[in-house]
């Protein structure tokens, strides 16, 4: 069932008329006297709870509202101090100590302490909350048993407050990415009194994240957020590095259409289109006519489809291979996406340090062989199949093209279904799909980050697929002596992934953005992660 027409009309009306709402007066980019950044991010986030967020819009908002122990310079991937002003790596990478800065405060003015992190990491690892990234932190001593409910006493988990300003984390095994994980916003602290005022610590429906309730420790604080209305974040005066924050406010408009985003930009209603994708028919125009406002960024990210391996016919690997080998990816990137994307024949992007194995390229004859082997010659007898994607024009265009390829090459009819973002995320995570659109970027620009999400039981594994040898190789990569050995193990794991084909890589992203000249110091990067420090509106730049 599609809700696209009504949804697009509502968004179109929103995009072309500046709506004033209670508690939130919107501005226009024509008013250059205020330090207010107006932007779109593809859609509003599914949640702004750091221990539940998984989507790109959510992470972009969390970067403004929350801060973890460390931060990352996403131009160089160098780790920087966050709440922790310094840190030590001890016992050959099995013990970490973080010294928290004295002036770290919550948005209500209270100090951020080491005990806040103990509470927050206990919450992050609580089974009832449903944290999708919890498995990534099983390297912490007893984190796995606690998350599984086998251990009830969190004091036995390797997260301890040694003092008000010193936090210690003890691991059971080394993790080459651990400090990078510590710098990710999903590990940011939450304010205990605020969380428990509005519900249980591990209640996923807790209302503490609502405007008026929310307390964070990032450079901005939430003041307004209602369904289908502009989200407003204002500067947090208690943030420890408040002098580096030049913006007084960020306004994020609720748009789930790249066409409407571009129209709003063109009409001066937003400074920044930051949803990672522009309308295909506008890319060439901005690239040639307004190159100073158009930004294209090669991304460490992959666009792919997920097969539900728990549901027929995709419980059969030959069906998955048939559907995978019948896609002409070069046609998709050359005729539909048109932003110089590279076709993907693996989940992991190719980099200087890691060359992933490659699946077969477009091979309709081989695809038909696999479909026949699965018992569906010429598509006969195959169950009804639906491809589900979230509402966005480019997803629809790609889905229609791929639907036609499956019909032409396999004689299989596939229905299409689009859903709004939050509905789509729940639908996919609950394995209700046959085939679902997905996209994944590594916050760390590392293949382990992508491949690790396909291990058994990982909260981001929306395929239902499980392979013991794949899991073993991923675990072994944590203990590798060096990157050469680590990447060799990951290569073996990815070879299994491509042989089992629980997902279908389509292409590697090239992000495309629009930014007004008056927006200064906003930098784009290969993992689509914002840094709001130092960003300001330069009124003189638009004159």
Explain the meaning of each model-derived region.
Residues 40-91, 215-216:
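N-terminal lobe/hinge region of extracytoplasmic solute-binding protein
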Residues 74, 165, 170-244, 249, ...:
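Gly/Pro-rich hinge or "lid" segments in bacterial periplasmic/extracellular proteins
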Residues 235, 314-404, 408, 466, ...:
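Append "and occasionally in soluble cytosolic enzymes with long acidic Gly/Pro-rich linkers
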């Amino acid at each position: 069932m599609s809700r696209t027409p009504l949804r697009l009309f509502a968004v179109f009306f929103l995009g072309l008329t500046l709506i004033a709402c209670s508690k939130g007066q919107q501005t226009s980019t024509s008013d250059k006297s205020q330090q207010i950044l107006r932007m779109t991010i593809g859609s509003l986030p599914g949640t702004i709870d750091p221990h539940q967020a998984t989507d790109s819009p959510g992470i972009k908002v969390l970067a403004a509202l929350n801060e973890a122990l460390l931060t990352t310079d996403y131009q160089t991937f160098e780790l920087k101090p966050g709440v922790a002003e310094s840190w030590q790596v001890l016992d050959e990478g099995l013990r970490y100590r973080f010294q928290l800065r004295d002036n770290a405060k919550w948005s209500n003015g209270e100090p951020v302490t080491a005990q806040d992190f103990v509470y927050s990491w206990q919450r992050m690892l609580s089974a009832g909350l449903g944290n999708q990234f919890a498995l990534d932190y099983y390297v912490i001593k007893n984190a796995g048993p606690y998350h599984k409910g086998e251990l009830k006493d969190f004091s036995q988990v390797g997260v301890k407050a040694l003092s008000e300003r010193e936090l210690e984390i003890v691991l059971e095994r080394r993790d080459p990415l651990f400090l990078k994980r510590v710098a990710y916003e999903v590990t940011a602290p939450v304010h205990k009194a605020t969380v428990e005022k509005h519900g249980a610590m591990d209640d996923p429906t807790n209302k503490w994240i609502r405007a008026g309730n929310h307390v964070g420790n990032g450079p901005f604080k939430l003041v307004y957020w209602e369904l289908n209305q502009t989200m407003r974040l204002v500067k947090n005066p208690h943030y420890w590095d408040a002098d580096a924050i030049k913006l007084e406010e960020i306004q994020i408009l609720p748009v789930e259409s790249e066409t409407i985003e571009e129209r709003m930009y063109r009409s001066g209603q937003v400074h920044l289109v930051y949803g990672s994708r522009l309308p295909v028919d506008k890319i060439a125009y901005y690239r040639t006519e307004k190159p100073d406002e158009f930004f294209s960024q090669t991304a460490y990210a992959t666009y792919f489809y997920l097969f539900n391996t728990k549901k027929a016919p995709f419980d059969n690997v030959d069906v998955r291979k048939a559907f995978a080998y019948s896609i002409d990816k070069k046609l998709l990137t050359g005729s539909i996406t048109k932003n110089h994307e590279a076709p993907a024949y693996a989940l992991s992007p190719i980099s200087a340090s890691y060359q992933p194995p490659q699946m077969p390229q477009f091979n309709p004859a081989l695809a038909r062989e696999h479909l026949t082997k699965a018992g569906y010659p010429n598509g006969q007898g195959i169950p009804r199949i639906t491809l589900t994607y979230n509402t966005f024009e480019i997803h629809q265009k790609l889905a229609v093209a791929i639907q036609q390829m499956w019909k032409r090459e396999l004689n299989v009819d596939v229905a299409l279904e689009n859903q709004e973002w939050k509905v789509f995320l729940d639908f996919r995570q609950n394995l209700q799909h046959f085939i679902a659109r997905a996209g994944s970027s590594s916050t760390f620009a590392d293949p382990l980050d992508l491949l690790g999400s396909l291990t058994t039981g990982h909260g981001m594994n929306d395929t239902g697929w499980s392979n013991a040898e794949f899991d073993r190789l991923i675990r072994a990569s944590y203990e590798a002596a060096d990157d050469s050995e680590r990447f060799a193990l990951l290569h073996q794991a990815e070879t299994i992934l491509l042989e089992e084909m629980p997902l279908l890589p389509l292409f590697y992203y090239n992000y495309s953005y629009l930014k007004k000249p008056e927006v200064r110091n906003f930098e784009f990067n290969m993992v689509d992660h914002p840094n709001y420090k130092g960003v300001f509106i330069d009124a003189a730049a638009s004159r």
